[in-house]
Amino acid sequence: MILTKAQYEEIAQCLVSVPPTRQSLRKLKQRFPSQSQATLLSIFSQEYQKHIKRTHAKHHTPEAIESYYQRYLNGVGKNGAAPVLLELANEVDYAPSLMARIILERFLQGHEQTPPSKSVINSMLRDPSQIPDGVLANQVYQCIVNDCCYGPLVDCIKHAIGYEHEVLLRDLLLKKNLSFLDEDQLRAKGYDKTPDFILQVPVAVEGHIIHWIESKASFGDECSHHAYLHGQFWSYWNRFGPGLVIYWYGFIQELDCNRERGILLKASFPTDIVTLCHSTA
């Protein structure tokens, strides 16, 4: 789904004052019925992540951490089965999984002789049964499963969706009988930064020569696209020539402004691929 900047900003504006919950996503779908659920979810997640980055620091001051921890202790002291940590995260407008990390780190600091390592924290968040306190383990679990934008569960889902779309792209290339090298093959050849697929024989799409294709299972907004441009796409262009980026969940139309410089954006696999023998694949 390709949106104009105005259409995107209308959706983003609706997300300013809503909590990152599945109920909010359902309301967003009702407000914009013509947009796909996947596109709205991607925008929803990206906008919330921007908000979290802007407000992250205030939640990590020593005063804030101690305040949250004492509120957690008071809450579970009254009712350990209540979703104390989840409700605290929602109240202070912070991602539940990130709030769980704050409280878990603070708990371990008070119960362990040495500060917990990042790997230990991550392992406990992935598997709360490792947490040496049953009440806290349950509280952390509630945060993880109810967070639709952050946390190990969301990370696993995003990884699976990204892989699924890479497999889809591979299948479409094979169906079109287009020869390619994938990321693993390219790294085996010594390349450190590579697109998902390099075409062994270039093709043309909408009059533009394409040497490589990158799959992005997300919506291409201004922030993420500019980060990808400078972190990935221009590097690919510099090494392999012009290429194509597929944002499977759509992008802002105005961002497709580098076609003449060698980076083409699409929201789906192109249907008008022209091979060197001048036939449509």
Curated annotation (Swiss-Prot):
Name of encoding gene: Cdin1
Location, primary (coarse class): nucleus
Stored PANTHER family: CDAN1-INTERACTING NUCLEASE 1, SIMILAR TO CDNA SEQUENCE BC052040
Source domain of life: Eukaryota
Function of the molecule: Plays a role in erythroid cell differentiation.
Protein localization: Nucleus; Cytoplasm
Native species: Mus musculus (Mouse)
Keywords: Cytoplasm, Nucleus, Phosphoprotein
Keyword Phosphoprotein on entry: yes
Name this protein carries in UniProt: CDAN1-interacting nuclease 1
Modification sites for Phosphothreonine: 114
Keyword rRNA-binding recorded: no
BP GO terms, sorted: erythrocyte differentiation
Record-level GO cellular component terms: cytoplasm; nucleus
InterPro entries (alphabetical): CDIN1
Residues annotated as signal peptide: none
